[in-house]
A protein has these predicted regions:
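N-terminal helix-turn-helix DNA-binding core of bacterial DNA-binding proteins
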Residues: 51-97, 108, 191, 209-249, ...
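N-terminal leader segment of winged-helix/HTH proteins
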Residues: 1-63, 163-217
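N-terminal positioning helix adjacent to the helix-turn-helix/winged-helix DNA-binding module
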Residues: 38, 68, 130, 157, ...
């Protein structure tokens, strides 16, 4: 199958006319004072580690199967004859995403659906022979993705990382119990609570949801990352910017294009290379960045509210090491 591009909510961010003094300093050519890195660190590192996981997946896993598709195969291999709702809860995916996955994988002959006994409106799911063969062929490669992702940590720190991420995501070890003999494979635990890639995805989904609650549609987290990086490193080019914010060149270019159109970023020719454009924040861009600071802090607070301050710092350090994999 081909790949396909997966507490109390805060008040959405409103547009405010107030300006931060740094915006005026920047406009006047003075020294700027961008927000502290820690305000955005968790979300940015989670996004980067998710991208590392996706890169490893593309490098190692054959056949064009996606991580969510394999997760469906894995769950149904461990617990056949569950319904679609139970599958979605086990994968931490919304109803629409699970329905689309199940429909496409059913059409591809990887899973089968049968009406549940005594409930004509409910279908149970299980792997077909083809689905079982595909799972068996992919499993060793998927295990390598998880092992490569955490290779920089070592066994002890990996265990610590998993425990911290279980707290962040509220994924409880032992909540997903296999009903068939588990496939014993180093790097591919039967319990998703011990799967680093799964925990990173669930945490990233939470961050995205919290960001929408707090900031709304005014500014996306990747756009904020670009503004923040340019506040800290004014005058870098687009290639350098993409590297700094851990985004592929094309998506980074689209973000810069949109922010430039909104008057929040400006491009100027490099005096030493006329073909190269240098990027800086405008006073408007700096003002927008400071407007989102309270909301960004609320996102981080919600995401890490069950961690102590020391645990949060430890998680940041571990995510930072994983982001360089």
């Amino acid at each position: 199958m081909p790949r396909r591009a997966a507490t109390r909510p805060a008040t959405p961010l409103a547009r405010r006319p107030s300006r931060h003094p740094a915006a005026d300093e920047t406009a006047a050519g003075g020294e700027s004072h961008p927000p502290d890195e820690a305000v955005f660190a968790v979300g940015g590192l989670l996004r980067t580690v998710q991208q590392v996981h996706d890169r490893l997946w593309q490098e190692l896993v054959p056949g064009g199967y996606t991580s969510p598709q394999f997760a469906v195969l894995h769950r149904l291999r461990m617990r056949p004859d569950i319904d679609q709702r139970t599958l979605g809860e086990g994968l931490s995916l919304d109803k629409a995403t699970v329905a689309d996955l199940v429909a496409r994988m059913d059409q591809a002959g990887l899973i089968g659906r049968e009406r549940a006994a005594g409930d004509a409106g409910r279908y149970t799911l299980r792997l077909t022979g083809t689905g079982r063969a595909v799972f068996t062929g992919l499993a060793p490669w998927v295990a390598q993705v998880q092992l490569r992702l955490t290779a920089a940590l070592g066994p002890q720190d990996t265990g610590r990382f998993l425990r911290l991420m279980q707290t962040v995501t509220s994924v409880i070890p032992g909540a997903w119990t296999p009903t068939t003999p588990a496939l014993v494979l180093i790097g591919l635990p039967a319990d998703p609570a011990h799967n680093p890639g799964y925990l990173v995805r669930v945490a990233q989904q939470r961050h995205t949801r919290y960001w929408a609650d707090a900031v709304g549609t005014r500014l996306t987290a990747p756009q904020q990352g670009v503004l923040h990086r340019l506040a800290r490193e004014p005058g870098i080019d687009q290639t350098t910017l993409a590297e700094r914010v851990a985004l592929p060149k094309a998506p980074a270019g689209e973000i810069v294009k949109r922010l430039t159109a909104r008057g929040e970023v400006q491009r100027t020719p490099d005096p030493h290379d006329g073909r190269r454009k240098l990027l800086t924040l405008t006073s408007k861009g700096f003002n927008v960045l400071y407007e989102v600071m309270p909301a960004a802090r609320e996102v981080q607070r919600r995401l890490t509210q069950d961690l102590t301050a020391d645990e949060r710092d430890e998680l940041l350090a571990l995510l930072g090491r994983l982001s360089k994999a």
